[in-house]
Amino acid sequence: MTNPSTFTASKLASAVIGALLLSSVPAHAADIWLDSATTGWATQNGGTKGGSRAAANNIYTAKNAAELKTALKASVGANGRIIKITGIIDISEGKAYTTTADMKVRGRLDIPGKTTIVGTTSNAEIREGFLYAKENDVIIRNITIENPWDPEPKWDPTDGSAGNWNSEYDGLTIEGANNVWVDHVTFTDGRRTDDQNGTANGRPKQHHDGALDVKNGANYVTISYSAFKSHEKNNLIGSSDSRTTDDGKLKVTIHNTLFENISARAPRVRFGQVHLYNNYHVGSTSHKVYPFSYAHGMGKNSKIFSERNAFEISGISGCDKIAGDYGGNVYRDTGSTVNGTALTCPWSTNIGWTPPYSYTPLAADKVAADVKAKAGAGKL
């Protein structure tokens, strides 16, 4: 029979040891604004920490446009800033933009280096604005970004065989910055889908540009567990064939991310070493608003490594609609599927690089369930 006093002493000792162990874990371990990037290219070049080490007086909460702009412009210490987004923020403050120039002045949000922006409520969202990351070491997590709607699209008769309408501003532009992590962010046309815009000059009047673009020498970028929904031209990595200085830069990882009813550019790549793994693409070539055209655009000197992605696209069966030829000549895929069948592509697989970071990809048949459960804002 156990001596009661011995049993009590044993329990007490266990409790003390447990308390000591718990005391070695930071009290803020569950605070997502204190995280650094853990996957993909953003872990390289010294890693991506954002404002995770910000001093207490450099941590802001923003629930409206004025508070967000103040937090972005504030002078902060050497360890940067954290901005917590609560609820839906309308950058226009209820006053509709009248011109592209008006939108540029009132809608642009420049993100300083060493900044973490994180949604802390289930409905955290930025509307009627567009974000620029042009400085190093930025983290954006757990928010919805409604893609900006340009009130003044321009007609270009030389765009394509019949001309096209083009607009300005992406939901997020990463331009010339090193080390950016975009995690659990949802990008969507939201309240203004393309079927509401009508036509002119015989073509749909397009008020949207991109959702998320990476350009002008940006480098070491990871987009993880995010969601792109209902958009035409989604992601551009590399802005011009003539910008040859981008070669050796534009290192981007996109993984475990949803592409739902995305027509094209998921992503379209020039020059970059781009790793695309465990992404879930779902759509249809006959969708009434966002018909699928292609996913991965092979542009000039692009070096795409596609790995264990799952494509569920009604109306396609082969690689020609997965990897679109836009001047590239190499493309490596391993383990991806199209409507449950192994993807086979005719391109040279000699992309000339392998990921320098560790990762453990799922099999393609596990991707849909994982992405549906975990990708996008509100799922951290």
UniProtKB/Swiss-Prot annotation:
Keywords: Calcium, Lyase, Metal-binding, Secreted, Signal. SUPFAM superfamilies: Pectin lyase-like. SMART domains: Amb_all (SM00656). GO terms for molecular function: metal ion binding; pectate lyase activity. Its main location: secreted. The keyword Protein biosynthesis does not apply. Belongs to the polysaccharide lyase 1 family. The keyword Secreted applies. Plays a role in bacterial invasion of plants. It comes from Pseudomonas fluorescens. This is Pectate lyase.
